[in-house]
């Protein structure tokens, strides 16, 4: 299918605008978060107060590593590679447990272990960041560490049914409060499974390791068999260890994010049967999110036990742009492209923080007003979702269909 003239023009404008947002706003904000002591400052509150002595999350640093490495690959600005190297050194020297293996959850502002929990989710993001850094500079040490983390995940976290998630410093199984919500004591989550797929996709792309490929295929199969709910065209969120669903939660942002990440995983894996299966699954999910969660301007957050949460979350809008643009490229359905452009329009008008020194508002009311209830930067607020949105849109081929 060929683009119509309006959509082609809209895509060109979209690419120009996200490039400008990336270069003139997102990158400069995160440049200022660099800590000369090592790594990046661990928190800025929603009123833009920098907390220089806040603890530093390993997830934050893995995502920052991914961001600067990927931005360098796109923009070829050598200064971005130095920011990536700064994040890499901190992740390697301070967040990695050389005695027991794996990444800590967080360290102090000076780089000493703070929350020494080992979480499968955390290890996955470290692999993701390390792979991007290897792509950017060819550092074999980074790729070796990524492979070591893969082996650690496989040897330490797997049970009969899949991957357990939360462990002590010495890899004793503990409660999974960090990735559970709504009072549900989840032993397995869609979220961690999705980001294992994301990480293993990149590691397999680089190494073509049979072991990594086999586990990536298994993760895609278990997602289709156990996590995907074909009756409602959605992903279940929380589970016990045997994949029995806990609660009734529908995460709109994770669903639309999953569509493009799983499409990418299938592309990299090259399994024709899985690719065909996921074409149907991901198109169904995208259609459902468009029908249920998109109100014409923005995406709702989630539904829990039948109660809608209409909060406008920064990462949900960003993943919506990427997910719907991918859905358009895969199907040729111009409605998906229109939705992606509408979400970007909302982001420009409301989600981007226009205050001097701000980045993106984390949370907005349904009326588009900032809630100032969540970090401007912190353990979960980083340039991964919005920065990646810019980079993915920038590289989307205008003739992708």
Identify what each model region corresponds to.
Residues 1-401:
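Glycan-recognition and catalytic cores of secretory/periplasmic carbohydrate-active enzymes
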């Amino acid at each position: 299918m060929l683009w119509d003239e309006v959509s082609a023009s809209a895509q060109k404008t979209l690419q120009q605008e996200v490039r400008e947002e990336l270069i003139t706003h997102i990158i400069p904000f995160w440049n200022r978060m660099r800590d000369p002591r090592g790594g990046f400052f661990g928190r800025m509150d929603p009123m833009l107060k920098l907390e220089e002595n806040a603890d530093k999350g390993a997830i934050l640093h893995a995502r920052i590593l991914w961001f600067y490495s990927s931005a360098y690959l796109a923009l070829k600005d050598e200064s971005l590679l130095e920011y990536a190297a700064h994040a890499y050194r901190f992740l390697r020297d301070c967040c990695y447990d050389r005695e027991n293996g794996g990444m800590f959850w967080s360290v102090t502002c000076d780089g000493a272990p703070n929350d020494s929990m080992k979480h499968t989710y955390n290890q996955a993001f470290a692999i993701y960041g390390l792979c991007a850094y290897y792509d950017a500079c060819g550092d074999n040490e980074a790729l070796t560490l990524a492979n070591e983390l893969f082996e650690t995940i496989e040897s330490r976290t797997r049970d009969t049914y899949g991957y357990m998630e939360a462990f002590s410093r010495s890899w004793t199984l503990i409660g999974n409060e960090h990735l559970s919500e709504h009072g549900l004591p989840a032993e397995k989550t869609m979220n961690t499974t999705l980001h294992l797929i994301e990480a293993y996709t990149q590691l397999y792309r680089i190494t073509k390791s049979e072991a990594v490929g086999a586990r990536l295929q298994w993760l895609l199969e278990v997602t289709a068999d156990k996590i995907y709910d074909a009756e409602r065209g959605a992903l279940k969120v929380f589970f016990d260890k045997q994949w029995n669903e806990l609660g009734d939660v529908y995460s709109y942002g994770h669903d639309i994010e999953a569509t493009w990440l799983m499409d990418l995983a299938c592309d990299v894996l090259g399994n024709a049967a899985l690719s065909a299966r996921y074409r149907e699954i991901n198109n169904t999910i995208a259609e459902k999110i468009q029908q249920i969660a998109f109100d014409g301007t923005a995406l709702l957050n989630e539904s829990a036990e039948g109660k809608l949460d209409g909060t406008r979350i920064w990462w949900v809008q960003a993943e919506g742009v990427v997910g719907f643009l991918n859905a358009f490229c895969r199907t040729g359905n111009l409605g998906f492209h229109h939705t992606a452009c509408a979400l970007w329009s909302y982001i420009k008008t409301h989600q981007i923080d226009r205050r001097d020194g701000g980045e993106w508002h984390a949370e907005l009311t349904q009326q588009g007003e900032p809630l100032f209830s969540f970090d401007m930067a912190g353990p979960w607020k980083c340039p991964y979702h919005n920065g990646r949105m810019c980079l993915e849109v920038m590289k989307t081929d205008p003739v992708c269909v």
